[in-house]
Amino acid sequence: MKILLTGATGLIGTEVMKTLAAAGHQVTATDRKDGEIPPGVEFILGELTDDNFVNSLDFNVDAIVHLGSIPQPFDDRDFEVFDNNVSCTYKVFAKAAANNVRVVVYASSLSIYGTAFSKPWTSPEFAPFDESLPLHHYESYALCKEVNERTADMWANRSKTAYVGLRFPFCNTEKAIEDHAIAQRDGHEETVTVAAKILWGYLDVRDAAHGILAILAGNSTGSHTYNFTAPDTTAPHPTHEMLAKFHPKTKVLRDIPGYGSLTDCSRWIAAYGYHPVHLIDRKKLGI
């Protein structure tokens, strides 16, 4: 399959690029910074903010994996985050439709629900939560994710291209996820707070990459977004205890046994059948 990958040297993109190449796909990868490029991958350095650069890319491909964006908000560049992430995504989506690309897979985020970066402490209305959880935006990163999802809807209406958005949690390497869990275990105050705000969710980048492979192998149509997380948490205590302590106002819809995730990914599993396999080893980490 001929694939265009944006954000190729970022955290998720690096693993996706490696996984796509290993699976035998013909990959053209682009990003604003250099990185380690697997054999057989064509890498093009450039900025998606530059219209001339975007126009120079070959969009005559079977699929696009769009991961190119500023990955989190900062107060001193709130507008820059929104402008970059929305305009670059619009360009890629429009080019996909114009070139009859079969499917576009793009990175959305669980931060779309508003808890991750909100200044006031914010809790989900209910848990486990599926994609129907109301969205509450407090900064431009969460807002741009919703705008991008609606942009995908529009282009799906106007073309035969399918758009699949993945609402990723904290997505990182095995080592970084382990360190995050250990810091919570050891009571590191900042990490404990951050983990509670992101609802203790995580996904290993290897699972992110194989989830994307599952989409590319499928027969997607229209525009859809999915929660996509590991089935457990990084928390040092059972989920019901963590909810009671940090999110006591959240309505618990059903029992969440043990260290089960607050995120309901059943729609994702039903659509593509991929279950994350790179899970934290609690015995190893002593949690």
Kindly label every feature range from the protein language model.
Residues 174, 179-193, 198-225:
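Alpha-helical substrate-binding/gating segment
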